[in-house]
Amino acid sequence: ILGREKFMTIVTCGRLSFPFSFAGNASGYIYNKALFRKVGLDPENPPTTWSEFTDMLNTFKDAGINPLQGSVADAWTTQAPLASLAGTLVPESKYTELKQGNTTVQELWKTTVEKESELFTYSTADTGVTYQQGTQNFAQGKAAIIPLGTYALPQILLINPDIELGFAQMPATDGASEQILTAGDDVMLTIGANTKHPKEAMKLVEFLMQKDQLDAYADAQSAITPLKDTYFGNDALETVRPFFEENRLADFCDHYIPSSINIGGYLQTMVTSGNTDRFLNQMQTEWDKVQARTFE
């Protein structure tokens, strides 16, 4: 899926299900190419290190342009930068260690959440607006970047079809070659194990998995196809093509966190307060509660 020779496996009630990946997305940030040019930045070559990234934000601030549009009123949007940064900073094997009790949330995410907390301090406008208002503000040219994934592109283009957008991986360290793009499945196809119409269902899946159908959906949703010859449904995504070609991809870190933990709510508080230690301690407490009632 998305450049890797495997399918995502979902275990339900002790039975295995193997969905086909139909469309994918990626996490990073969307940027306004016109504003890049206005301050003398090359929109075709976004920053590749954390220092370059923060320098870019300061360049916009110095020019009197809001560097970053937040949408923190909708807590789930704070999970996007966490996933973007953790893709580079936290190897996926560390989540197995967390589950085994061989590491802690503090050790796992300390640097990640500190960088996310810093990220929002670069905004010169109200970050506590909704996703709807935030994407509207961005579409109207009121900010240089919005730290959301590819899934937000259609919403922005719906508001302003003429805006020239770019999409980039959010660098998390000062080593350009170390950067990893957070990407994953957005839509998957399955067939019920006990369906009365297996042949008909398979025909539908086979139809939808044809390249023409995959590409058409990708075009409509600015999505990414799951084929080895990856197709990007929006030219804005071309800047992240090398990550797919070089298999520098990681899953969303919050996929490793049980849904019973309100990670978005805790992140929302962390971003607005800047108290990263409280967030890490809250997450550890909630993680321990889940593990205490989990039997395998």
Residue ranges and their predicted role:
Residues 54-60, 98-127:
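Glycine-centered hinge/linker elements that transmit conformational signals in sensory
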Residues 63-66, 140-148, 163:
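Alpha-to-beta junction loops
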Residues 39-42, 114, 157-220:
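Extracytoplasmic/periplasmic substrate-recognition and gating elements
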Residues 1-33, 54, 80-83, 166-167:
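Hinge/lid segment of periplasmic solute-binding proteins
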Residues 40-46, 100, 117-129, 142, ...:
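A local structural motif
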